């Protein structure tokens, strides 16, 4: 617990912060959006035409990766990264720790005293980091140390900047020698492929031509911000990311006046800097606002392919922490850092698209929308049969602590359709008395 003197010192430090006035804004520049991403446009600029076409067919159409183009892609990626100031590269992956991992290697490959910057196709496609110290969920013993990172071309490489340099980050999957998933990305890629195959099979039953299946996601990110002076005086926050004891404030969220309230200048400055960093990485941060609890806020992006959206969310959390530190703040991403007020969820706005058709869009007359009703029924059955797997996928000490305590979602898996869709399903399922005709197009 903070003593009166340390609390007074912390408040004095906050009170002495310079107040920034309102200045004339310069014209808006957005030409830096995605500047640090090895995007489709960059590929077309740096790669031979045939190589770019082959790589894009893997990214956009899901065709198997042609290993013969790896050397050309690696060379182009290296040239682009060097021009952007990167001296190192890393296979960026997501072990079962809830965060990301990376091991940096320099491009430097000297021949005698002659410095040469090199990056081979093998360096791009695969790496062998030691996996013995990463959690495996009981899949293997510690002495089974070998692990492999494999390039995921469907998520573009990007440049991560720091104080005096930059690193080329290559998104990768992480697995064992026997193919067991040691990360979060591998199961996601496998499930995306399985769902895509099932959707194509279903659409074939409706007589639709073969189209690309896209699983879209827009993960909202909630977070708390507190001044670093208060944070450093709370060992529980420093060690666990949440408070373990303390007295509730006289006023917290009873008046519901913080939600969507006017954003304080210090916080708004922080948000602006966060968005600039996100936009450089091609992350479509769209919405920012005060959340329900005091000192709680939210950042929401536009929808993207689910694999890319999750990679972007990992970067969002990292950038929130980094920018908070630069503003004399600490960003708390624990799901329940304070008792008695809302915790921080990560609401996932999820959908399935077939070509340009959103399969979860009911349209103006859902009762006549056979495709929508079929997909909806399949999702309801899947949740009913596999709620244990869904619940397990979001189970963690922090999230289990949050669910059911001053939160909107309960601790169980459930579906709420609303009265209109609920009545629609009840009506169409009443086959004994009434039958309706459905236009299959």
Q: Model segments located where?
A:
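Short, hydrophobic beta-strand segments
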Residues: 255-258, 297-306, 350
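Conserved small/polar residues in nucleotide/adenosyl-binding loops
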Residues: 427-436
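Active-site core of metal-dependent hydrolases
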Residues: 31-145
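Flexible, glycine/charged-enriched surface loops at secondary-structure junctions
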Residues: 66-68, 206-217, 285-289, 330-334, ...
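Catalytic or ion-translocation cores adjacent to nucleophile or general acid/base/metal-coordination motifs
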Residues: 262, 312-315, 319-333, 340-341, ...
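ATP/Mg2+-dependent ligation/transfer catalytic cores
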Residues: 147-275
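Polar, glycine-rich mid-to-C-terminal structural blocks
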Residues: 374, 378-425
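Short, conserved phosphate-binding/catalytic loop or strand-edge motifs used
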Residues: 221, 291-299, 344-346
């Amino acid at each position: 617990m903070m003593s009166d003197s340390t609390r007074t010192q912390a408040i004095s430090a906050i009170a002495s912060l310079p107040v920034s006035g309102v200045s004339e804004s310069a014209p808006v520049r957005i030409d830096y959006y995605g500047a640090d991403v090895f995007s489709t446009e960059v590929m077309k600029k740096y790669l031979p035409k045939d190589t770019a076409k082959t790589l894009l067919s893997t990214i956009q159409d899901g065709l198997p990766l042609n290993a013969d183009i790896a050397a050309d892609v690696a060379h182009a990626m290296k040239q682009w990264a060097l021009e952007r100031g990167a001296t190192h590269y890393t296979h960026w992956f997501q072990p079962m720790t809830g965060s990301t991992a990376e091991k940096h290697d320099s491009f430097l490959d000297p021949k005698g005293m002659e410095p040469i910057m090199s990056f081979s196709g093998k360096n791009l496609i695969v790496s062998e980091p030691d996996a013995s110290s990463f959690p495996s969920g009981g899949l293997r013993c510690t002495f089974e140390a070998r692990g492999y990172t494999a390039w995921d071309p469907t998520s573009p490489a990007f440049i991560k900047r720091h104080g005096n340099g930059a690193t080329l980050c290559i998104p990768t999957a992480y697995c064992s020698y026997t193919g067991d998933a040691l990360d979060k990305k591998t199961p996601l890629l496998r499930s995306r492929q399985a769902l895509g195959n099932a959707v194509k099979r279903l659409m074939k039953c409706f007589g639709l031509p073969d189209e690309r299946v896209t699983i879209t996601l827009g993960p909202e990110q909630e977070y708390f911000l507190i001044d670093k002076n208060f944070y450093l005086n709370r060992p529980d926050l420093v060690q666990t990311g949440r408070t373990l004891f303390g007295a509730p404030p006289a006023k917290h969220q009873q008046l519901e006046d913080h939600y969507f309230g006017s954003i304080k200048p210090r916080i708004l400055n922080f948000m602006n800097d966060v968005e600039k960093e996100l936009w450089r990485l091609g992350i479509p941060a769209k919405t920012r606002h005060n959340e329900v609890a005091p000192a709680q806020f939210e950042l929401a992006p536009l929808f993207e392919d689910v694999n890319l959206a999750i990679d972007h969310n990992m970067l969002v959390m990292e950038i929130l922490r980094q920018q908070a530190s630069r503003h004399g703040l600490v960003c708390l991403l624990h799901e329940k850092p304070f008792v008695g007020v809302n915790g921080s969820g990560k609401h996932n706005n999820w959908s399935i698209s077939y070509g340009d058709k959103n399969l979860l869009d009911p349209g103006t007359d859902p009762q006549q929308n056979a495709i929508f009703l079929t997909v909806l029924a399949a999702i309801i059955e899947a949740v009913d049969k596999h709620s244990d797997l869904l619940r397990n996928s979001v189970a963690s000490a922090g999230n289990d602590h949050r669910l059911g305590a001053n939160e909107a979602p309960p601790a169980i898996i459930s579906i709420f359709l609303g009265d209109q869709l609920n009545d629609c399903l009840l009506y169409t399922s009443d086959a004994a008395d009434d039958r309706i005709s459905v236009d299959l197009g």
